[in-house]
Regions:
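Two-component system phosphorelay core
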Residues: 1-57, 61-116
């Protein structure tokens, strides 16, 4: 699958990402590099250890990466989770949002794996 097809599959705006990053090879490189991004692992760790500071920082970083790369379906729950954790506490609804982030993350990783 091409990078443009990948963006179509994940429901994101390839043209907007191309305008922001400037070249398809750069987009492809950053998309594939996302597989090595530690933000989601840090988020998992923050939730597992109930460390709201770690979880907040990880959610905030993940949100930013998703905004830059146009990963809209992961950006939305990551942004909501960031706001939920902004007070550095696991408030009501944080666990449910984490579940949404985890599901969107896994779907995105699966789609990235199909880039040819």
């Amino acid at each position: 699958m091409t990078t443009e097809q990948f963006y179509r599959e994940i429901g994101s705006d390839y043209a907007a990402v191309l305008e922001r990053l400037g070249a398809e090879d750069m987009i492809r490189r950053f998309v594939l590099k996302f597989l090595q991004d530690p933000s989601f692992s840090a988020l998992e760790e923050g939730f597992a250890k109930r460390d709201a500071e770690v979880a907040f920082r990880a959610a905030h970083t993940l949100k930013g990466v998703c905004a830059n790369l146009g990963f809209d379906r992961l950006y939305a729950p990551a942004a909501a989770l960031t706001e939920k954790l902004r007070g550095r506490a696991f408030t009501e609804g944080a666990d449910a949002l984490y579940g949404e982030v985890a599901q969107a993350y896994r779907q995105l990783i699966d789609a990235i794996g199909r880039i040819g």
